[in-house]
């Protein structure tokens, strides 16, 4: 919930079969090449099963890529153009190719309190009631007021 995903970001971007004699898609999109051939259903099932996980309140920048089977923690930021090949811890900012941690978005104690609060599970009315606090309070003051 509340994930911010910029234009041209790719999440769970597909890979090619590195363990086969050819990388080309004629071997798994075979029906596009021959009338008597079928697509490789097992290959597509394997690709669908390799999903990326995106946490709550994340920001994935323009043209970033999040590879399959990678987890982006709650509150994390993926910089524009980054290629994420490993899990990103909650409230961590990553950048580069391959993506590497740049710094924590928030001090660990505040991040832990936000994780415990889980405001992203609040209903619409509670979010609206806290809107001014989201806009004006520091993270620490917000947590003090809202029980995190």
What label would you give each PLM region?
Residues 1-70:
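Flexible, glycine/small-residue-enriched loop-and-beta-strand segment within the central core
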Residues 73, 77-79, 83:
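A generic "structured core" feature
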Residues 134-148:
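C-terminal amphipathic helix plus adjacent low-complexity
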Residues 73-74, 89-91:
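Conserved catalytic segment of ABC-fold P-loop ATPases
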Residues 99-100:
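A short acidic/histidine/glycine-rich donor-binding loop in glycosyltransferase catalytic cores
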């Amino acid at each position: 919930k509340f994930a911010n995903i910029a234009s041209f970001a790719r999440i769970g971007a597909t890979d090619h079969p590195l363990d086969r004699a050819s990388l080309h898609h004629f071997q798994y999109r075979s029906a596009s090449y021959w009338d008597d051939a079928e697509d490789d259903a097992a290959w597509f099932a394997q690709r669908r099963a390799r999903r990326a996980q995106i946490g709550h309140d994340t920001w994935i920048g323009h043209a970033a890529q999040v590879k399959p089977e990678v987890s982006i923690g709650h509150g994390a930021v993926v910089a524009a153009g980054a290629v994420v090949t490993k899990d990103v811890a909650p409230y961590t900012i990553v950048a580069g190719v391959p993506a590497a941690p740049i710094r924590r978005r928030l001090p660990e104690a505040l991040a832990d309190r936000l994780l415990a609060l889980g405001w992203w599970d609040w209903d619409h009315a509670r979010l609206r009631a806290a809107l001014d606090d989201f806009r004006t309070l520091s993270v620490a003051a917000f947590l003090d007021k809202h029980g995190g």
